[in-house]
Design a protein with these regions (language model features):
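Catalytic alpha-helical scaffold of carbohydrate-active enzymes acting on polysaccharides/glycoconjugates
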Residues: 1-124
Length: 124
Protein backbone atom coordinates (compact mmCIF):
# COMPACT_ATOMS: atom_id res chain seq x y z
CA UNK A 1 0.00 0.00 0.00
CA UNK A 2 1.20 3.50 -0.83
CA UNK A 3 0.29 6.63 1.08
CA UNK A 4 0.49 10.20 -0.11
CA UNK A 5 1.27 12.97 2.35
CA UNK A 6 0.03 16.47 1.49
CA UNK A 7 1.11 19.28 3.78
CA UNK A 8 -0.80 22.59 3.54
CA UNK A 9 1.35 25.45 4.80
CA UNK A 10 -1.01 28.38 5.28
CA UNK A 11 0.79 30.84 7.56
CA UNK A 12 3.96 32.90 7.70
CA UNK A 13 5.01 31.09 10.88
CA UNK A 14 4.22 27.72 9.35
CA UNK A 15 6.40 28.54 6.36
CA UNK A 16 9.31 29.97 8.35
CA UNK A 17 9.34 27.49 11.23
CA UNK A 18 7.11 24.51 10.51
CA UNK A 19 8.08 23.61 6.95
CA UNK A 20 11.86 23.40 7.61
CA UNK A 21 11.25 21.26 10.70
CA UNK A 22 8.96 18.94 8.77
CA UNK A 23 11.55 18.65 6.00
CA UNK A 24 14.15 17.53 8.57
CA UNK A 25 11.76 15.00 10.13
CA UNK A 26 10.67 13.58 6.78
CA UNK A 27 14.23 13.39 5.41
CA UNK A 28 15.38 11.55 8.57
CA UNK A 29 12.68 8.95 7.91
CA UNK A 30 13.22 8.84 4.14
CA UNK A 31 9.61 9.91 3.63
CA UNK A 32 8.27 12.04 0.82
CA UNK A 33 5.53 14.65 0.86
CA UNK A 34 3.95 17.40 -1.20
CA UNK A 35 4.07 20.86 0.38
CA UNK A 36 1.38 23.31 -0.75
CA UNK A 37 2.11 26.89 0.27
CA UNK A 38 -0.05 29.98 0.57
CA UNK A 39 1.79 32.73 -1.29
CA UNK A 40 0.05 35.98 -0.40
CA UNK A 41 -0.66 37.88 2.80
CA UNK A 42 -1.06 35.98 6.06
CA UNK A 43 -4.51 37.14 7.15
CA UNK A 44 -4.92 34.46 9.82
CA UNK A 45 -6.16 37.03 12.33
CA UNK A 46 -9.19 37.72 10.14
CA UNK A 47 -10.43 34.21 10.89
CA UNK A 48 -11.74 35.66 14.17
CA UNK A 49 -15.00 36.31 12.33
CA UNK A 50 -15.49 32.53 12.31
CA UNK A 51 -16.27 32.69 16.04
CA UNK A 52 -19.90 33.10 15.00
CA UNK A 53 -19.94 29.87 12.96
CA UNK A 54 -21.35 26.67 14.40
CA UNK A 55 -18.63 24.39 15.72
CA UNK A 56 -15.82 26.94 15.64
CA UNK A 57 -15.51 27.40 19.40
CA UNK A 58 -15.62 23.63 19.86
CA UNK A 59 -12.68 23.30 17.47
CA UNK A 60 -10.75 26.05 19.29
CA UNK A 61 -11.26 24.29 22.62
CA UNK A 62 -10.22 20.95 21.15
CA UNK A 63 -6.97 22.26 19.68
CA UNK A 64 -4.37 24.49 21.23
CA UNK A 65 -4.81 27.40 18.81
CA UNK A 66 -2.49 29.80 20.63
CA UNK A 67 0.24 27.17 20.96
CA UNK A 68 -0.01 26.07 17.32
CA UNK A 69 -0.30 29.50 15.72
CA UNK A 70 1.28 31.91 18.21
CA UNK A 71 -0.13 35.27 19.21
CA UNK A 72 1.47 37.20 16.31
CA UNK A 73 -0.09 34.90 13.72
CA UNK A 74 -3.49 35.29 15.35
CA UNK A 75 -3.17 39.07 15.00
CA UNK A 76 -1.93 39.20 11.38
CA UNK A 77 -4.34 41.06 9.15
CA UNK A 78 -6.09 42.71 12.10
CA UNK A 79 -3.93 44.44 14.73
CA UNK A 80 -0.67 43.53 12.97
CA UNK A 81 0.07 43.98 9.27
CA UNK A 82 -0.11 40.78 7.25
CA UNK A 83 3.32 39.60 6.12
CA UNK A 84 3.61 38.62 2.46
CA UNK A 85 4.44 34.92 2.73
CA UNK A 86 5.62 34.43 -0.85
CA UNK A 87 7.84 37.49 -0.90
CA UNK A 88 9.38 36.96 2.52
CA UNK A 89 9.66 33.16 2.43
CA UNK A 90 10.52 32.37 -1.21
CA UNK A 91 13.93 31.07 -0.19
CA UNK A 92 12.42 28.65 2.30
CA UNK A 93 10.01 27.33 -0.32
CA UNK A 94 12.92 26.82 -2.72
CA UNK A 95 14.82 25.02 0.06
CA UNK A 96 11.89 22.62 0.50
CA UNK A 97 11.89 21.96 -3.26
CA UNK A 98 15.67 21.57 -3.32
CA UNK A 99 15.43 19.04 -0.48
CA UNK A 100 13.54 16.81 -2.91
CA UNK A 101 9.95 17.52 -2.00
CA UNK A 102 7.15 18.39 -4.38
CA UNK A 103 6.10 22.02 -3.92
CA UNK A 104 2.93 23.71 -5.14
CA UNK A 105 0.49 26.54 -4.53
CA UNK A 106 -2.26 26.08 -1.96
CA UNK A 107 -3.82 29.55 -2.19
CA UNK A 108 -2.96 33.22 -2.48
CA UNK A 109 -4.78 34.32 0.69
CA UNK A 110 -5.79 31.19 2.60
CA UNK A 111 -8.34 32.92 4.85
CA UNK A 112 -10.00 34.68 1.90
CA UNK A 113 -10.08 31.43 -0.09
CA UNK A 114 -11.45 29.37 2.79
CA UNK A 115 -14.14 31.92 3.62
CA UNK A 116 -15.36 32.23 0.02
CA UNK A 117 -14.86 28.88 -1.72
CA UNK A 118 -18.17 27.36 -0.58
CA UNK A 119 -20.25 30.07 -2.26
CA UNK A 120 -17.99 30.73 -5.24
CA UNK A 121 -19.33 30.49 -8.76
CA UNK A 122 -17.49 29.00 -11.75
CA UNK A 123 -16.06 32.39 -12.76
CA UNK A 124 -14.43 32.86 -9.34
Amino acid sequence: MKLALKIDVDTYRGTRQGAPRLVDILKARNAGASFLFSLGPDHTGRAITRVFRAGFLRKVRRTSVLEHYGIKTLLYGTLLPAPDIGRECAGIMRDVRDAGFEVGIHAWDHVLWQDNVARADAQW
